[in-house]
Regions:
Chain A
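Acidic, metal/ion-coordinating pockets
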Residues: 3, 7-308
C-alpha cells in the first residue's frame, strides 16, 4: 500500500473516530474525559541476533543487538505511559549461539527485556520439539499460539491460545497464529503438531477476547505479510476477521515504513505492521483510549536500531 | 524517504520522517464542520548507547563459554584453501564433506554433492582450524538434503551450473564450452543415463529452488537435519582422529573448452 492509500484509509478510520466524537460537540471537551495512552512496541524474526550485526554484514553492519533494543524500550517505559512489548516469532535461528545453547539465551534475553507476549516461528523448532519445550519451561516463557494443537507433544500445557494483559485501566487481549510448519521445517515428530485453520482459530479466539471486554485485540502472527499466490497471510487474516485491531506480523522480513490498514469483516479496520528482521527494526504504535470513545491510533514509529559508532 | 524532525534524548538521534496533519470536512452536519485527526507516521534511525551493564552481566558467562567453544581447535590445514570460480579446492573440500555426511547418515550410495557458490565466504586459512573458522566460512544456515534425481533432470541441473561457470561439486565431471554449455558429463566416472536414478546431496536452500534450482524443488527428498557447519566439523574431525591434517582434492571438477 502506498502512502496515498494509507492516508486515504486513515481518513476513513479517522471518520469513524470523528463521528463518535461529534456528539460530544466540542473537541476541547476531550480534557474532561479520562485518556490513557498505550504504546505497543514489537519485534519479529530476531533470529538469534543477540549482538549487533558484525561489521562485514553489509547494509546491516552495526545494527540491532539487544543492548540497543533495551535502551529504546527503557526510554518508552520511562515516559510513564503503559507500554506493551511483543514478539511475532522466529527469535531463534541456526547460529553459533543457537548451536551452543539451543534457544536458552534468546528466551532469557526476551525475559530480561520484559516481553509481555510472544508467539513462535518455524525456526524456533529447529532444535526439535522437545528441546523447545525444555527451553521454554526452563526460562518460564509461555508462547501464544491458537492455531496449533500441541497436545500430543512435550509442548502440551506449555502454550496458550491467548492471554489478557492488564495495563493500568486497559484490558489487552493478545492471541497468536503461526504458519503451516510442515513445508517449512523438517524435524522429527512434526506430524504430532496439528495445524488448525489460522483464520478460523483467530476469529474464534478474538471473539472470546471480545466477550471478555478487551479494550484492544492484538494478534501476533508468524504467517507472513502477504503472498502473490494468496495463501494464508496477515493480509488474508486482516480482511477476514471480525474484531482484531492490530496484527503484529513476521516471517517475511518486511521493513514496514508504516503500517498497512485493511477493512475487515465488521466494516472496521485491522492494522498490520512488521518490523523487518534481526532486531534491526522495532515497530511502535501509539493508541489513545478515552472512556467515551474507542481507541484511536495517534502515532506510528518504525525505528531502525543502530549502534553508536566508535569515533 | 527520511526527513528531519526532532530528537528524543541526547544519545538518540532521529532522522525522520513526516508528520501528517490533516483536516477534513464533514458535510452532513455543517455545525461540526471540522474535525481534526492527527497521525504521525515516522520511520527513523536511532543510535542507541552501546553498553548496558545488566545485559553485559547476564551475557558474560554465555559469551565466555561461547568464545571458548568457537576457539576450540578441531583440525589442521597445511596451507590456505581457496574457493575459485566454480569451486576450487575449497569447493571440493566442502562438497566432499557433504558427500561423506550424507553417506554416513543415509547408508545409501550418494553419487554427487553440490553447493551454490555463494554458500562460502572467504577461505580456509593455513594452520589450526577452529569451530569459529567454520562459522566465518559458512555464514548461511544451510542444512543438507539428499535428493533422488533422474539422469535427465541431473543433466538439466548441470547445464544450469555450467551456465554460471560451474558450481561447487564432488562426484561429477564435465567440460564447459565457449557457449557455457556442459559437455561430456560424467557422474562417478560414468556417462549419465537419462533414465537412471541418482542420489545427490545439496543444501536445503537449493532443494527449495534457490539460486534458480527450480528443477530440484519437486524431487523426492530426505532432509538430514544436519547443518553445513556440523557436516564440515565432522569431516575435519575425521582427519584429526587419524592424527592427520586435512586432505584437499585440488583437481578441477570441470574443464573449460576454448576453441
Amino acid at each position: 500500500m502506498n502512502r496515498r492509500n494509507f492516508i486515504q484509509n486513515t481518513v476513513k478510520a479517522g471518520l469513524f473516530t470523528g463521528i463518535s466524537l461529534l456528539p460530544a460537540g466540542n473537541l476541547l471537551a476531550k480534557n474532561s474525559m479520562t485518556e490513557t495512552q498505550l504504546t505497543i512496541l514489537h519485534t519479529n524474526d530476531t533470529h538469534s541476533q543477540i549482538f549487533p550485526f558484525e561489521n562485514n554484514s553489509g547494509p546491516y553492519a552495526g545494527m540491532g543487538g539487544i543492548e540497543s533494543r533495551k535502551k529504546i524500550i527503557e526510554q518508552i517505559r520511562g515516559t510513564g505511559n503503559p507500554a506493551l512489548l511483543l514478539d511475532a516469532g522466529d527469535f531463534c535461528d541456526d547460529s553459533s549461539i543457537y548451536d551452543a545453547y539451543k534457544g536458552k539465551v534468546e528466551l532469557e534475553a526476551m525475559r530480561l527485556l520484559g516481553y509481555d507476549a510472544f508467539t513462535l516461528g518455524e525456526k524456533d523448532f529447529l532444535g526439535g520439539i522437545d528441546n523447545l519445550a525444555t527451553q521454554l519451561k526452563h526460562t518460564g516463557m509461555k508462547p501464544i499460539v491458537c492455531n496449533y494443537d500441541f497436545t500430543h507433544t512435550s509442548l502440551q500445557n506449555w502454550y496458550q491460545p491467548y492471554t489478557i494483559i492488564q495495563k493500568e485501566n486497559l484490558k489487552i487481549g493478545v492471541l497468536g497464529v503461526l504458519l503451516p510448519l510442515h513445508d517449512k521445517i523438517s524435524i522429527s515428530g512434526i506430524e504430532n503438531l496439528v495445524y488448525l485453520d489460522a483464520v478460523m482459530q483467530a476469529n474464534k479466539t478474538a471473539a472470546i477476547l471480545q466477550q471478555q471486554h478487551c479494550d484492544i485485540i492484538i494478534c501476533l502472527s508468524h504467517l507472513g505479510d502477504r503472498y502473490a499466490d494468496g495463501r494464508i497471510s496477515d493480509e488474508v487474516l486482516a480482511k477476514n476477521n471480525q474484531c482484531i485491531d492490530v496484527i503484529i506480523g513476521g516471517h517475511t522480513h518486511q521493513f514496514f515504513k508504516q503500517p498497512r490498514l485493511y477493512k475487515n469483516k465488521s466494516s472496521s479496520y485491522t492494522l498490520v505492521n512488521q518490523a523487518g528482521w534481526g532486531g534491526i527494526q522495532m515497530g511502535q504504535l501509539d493508541y489513545v483510549f478515552t472512556n467515551t470513545t474507542n481507541k484511536k491510533l495517534i502515532r506510528t514509529k518504525n525505528i531502525l536500531l543502530r549502534e553508536k559508532k566508535n569515533e | 524517504m527520511l526527513y528531519l524532525t526532532f530528537s528524543i534524548t541526547t544519545v538518540s538521534m532521529i532522522r525522520s520522517i513526516f508528520i501528517i496533519l490533516f483536516y477534513y470536512s464533514f458535510c452532513i452536519q455543517p455545525l461540526f464542520a471540522q474535525a481534526i485527526t492527527q497521525v504521525h507516521f515516522q520511520y527513523h534511525a536511532v543510535t542507541a548507547a552501546q553498553k548496558d551493564s545488566t545485559v553485559q552481566q547476564w551475557l558474560q558467562p554465555y559469551t565466555d563459554s561461547l568464545n571458548h567453544y568457537l576457539n576450540s581447535v578441531i583440525g589442521f590445514s597445511l596451507e590456505n584453501v581457496y574457493k575459485k570460480k566454480g569451486g576450487g579446492p575449497l569447493g571440493n573440500f566442502i562438497t566432499a564433506a557433504m558427500l561423506q555426511q550424507a553417506l554416513l547418515q543415509t547408508a545409501t550410495k550418494i553419487d554427487a554433492a553440490f553447493l551454490h557458490p555463494a554458500g562460502i565466504k572467504g577461505f580456509l586459512p593455513q594452520g589450526n582450524i577452529t569451530i569459529g573458522t567454520l562459522y566465518a566460512l559458512l555464514p548461511y544456515t544451510n542444512r543438507l538434503v539428499v535428493q533422488q534425481i533422474s539422469g535427465a533432470i541431473l543433466e538439466e541441473f548441470v547445464h544450469r551450473m555450467a551456465a554460471d561457470g560451474g558450481w561447487l561439486s564432488t562426484g561429477i565431471n564435465y567440460a564447459i564450452d565457449v557457449y557455457g554449455k556442459a559437455k561430456n558429463i560424467r557422474i562417478q566416472q560414468q556417462p549419465i543415463l537419462p533414465n537412471a536414478v541418482y542420489h545427490i546431496v545439496v543444501s536445503d536452500y537449493m532443494a527449495n529452488g534457490g539460486s534458480n534450482c527450480s528443477m530440484l524443488r519437486s524431487l523426492p527428498s530426505i532432509p538430514l537435519h544436519t547443518t553445513l557447519i556440523e557436516t564440515c566439523k565432522n569431516y575435519i574431525q575425521s582427519f584429526t582422529n587419524n592424527h592427520e591434517p586435512i586432505t584437499v582434492n585440488k583437481a578441477a571438477q570441470f574443464t573449460n573448452i576454448y576453441e
